């Protein structure tokens, strides 16, 4: 909502500037009318004032277009999001500060023991590709570890080595068998991944969700807070993921952290569709 309010305020300011410029133009013309032989000065004054007005009008048009874009983006992100999405994540306890620091030990400390999980994890974050799996007994803290990794600045730092000059986008999903249907389904997974990615990269929305983008713009006034969001079908969610996978020339790289696969009740080909990602990596346990 703050984006809409900010843009609306800027438009109001620009409109006040236009009014001021028009009044100034009127005043200048009034002053010059009594002058003899002042026609050239009048024309020059009018040209300068009108140039300022037209520039301001162009700025306002740009702001209006930006407002429409922000409104459409908000509609679509609202349509992807769902109330239960953060529930499982928020229920997982935060790890003690030093509990999992072993995961970020320098590789040199484990050079003689390459089989260690921490060494392999750091290698994967910095240089690897494909899927890195973490397994363990029920109640052993796997979800807490996953939450810790996804949130740790050390993870982002290691991924930057892999991404080189590209930006890093981290997306997460936490399956939950104790939750409702969407919290343990592939629909929840697809919505979470798409929401996380497009919330951080909103400029991708028109490419990834073309039909939804068109529907979101129907009869939409600038700066109108979205009252309803376009609905997505299962087919559209799958198409969006597949479309995202084809965007290989992006200035970003993605890392997905998916927790609780043993609590997943959907079709496993969806997991394969998400994980087989050209030039990207998926992080699951």
Name each model-derived stretch:
Residues 1-285:
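Conserved NB-ARC/NACHT P-loop NTPase core of NLR-like innate immune receptors
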């Amino acid at each position: 909502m703050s984006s809409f309010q900010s843009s609306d305020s800027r438009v109001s300011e620009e409109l006040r500037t236009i009014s001021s410029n028009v009044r100034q133009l009127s005043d200048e013309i009034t002053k010059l009318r009594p002058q003899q032989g002042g026609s050239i000065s009048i024309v020059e004054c009018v040209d300068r004032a009108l140039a300022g007005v037209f520039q301001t009008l162009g700025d306002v048009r740009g702001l209006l277009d930006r407002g429409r874009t922000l409104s459409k983006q908000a509609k679509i992100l609202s349509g992807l999001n769902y109330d239960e999405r953060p529930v499982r994540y928020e229920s997982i306890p935060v790890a003690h500060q030093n509990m999992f620091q072993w995961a970020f030990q320098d590789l040199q400390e484990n050079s003689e023991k390459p089989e260690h999980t921490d060494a392999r994890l750091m290698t994967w974050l910095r240089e690897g590709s494909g899927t890195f799996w973490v397994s363990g007994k029920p109640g052993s803290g796997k979800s807490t570890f996953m939450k810790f990794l996804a949130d740790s600045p050390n993870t982002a730092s290691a991924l930057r080595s892999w991404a080189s000059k590209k930006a890093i986008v981290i997306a997460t999903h936490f399956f939950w068998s104790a939750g409702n249907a969407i919290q343990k389904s592939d629909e929840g997974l697809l919505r979470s991944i798409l929401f996380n990615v497009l919330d951080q990269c909103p400029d991708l929305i028109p490419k990834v969700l073309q039909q939804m983008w068109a529907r979101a713009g129907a009869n939409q006034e600038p700066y109108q807070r979205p009252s309803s969001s376009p609905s997505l079908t299962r087919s559209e969610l799958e198409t969006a993921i597949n479309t995202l996978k084809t965007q290989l020339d992006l200035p970003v790289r993605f890392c997905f952290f998916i927790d609780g696969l043993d609590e997943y009740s959907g079709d496993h080909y969806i997991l394969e569709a998400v994980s087989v990602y050209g030039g990207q990596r998926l992080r699951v346990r």
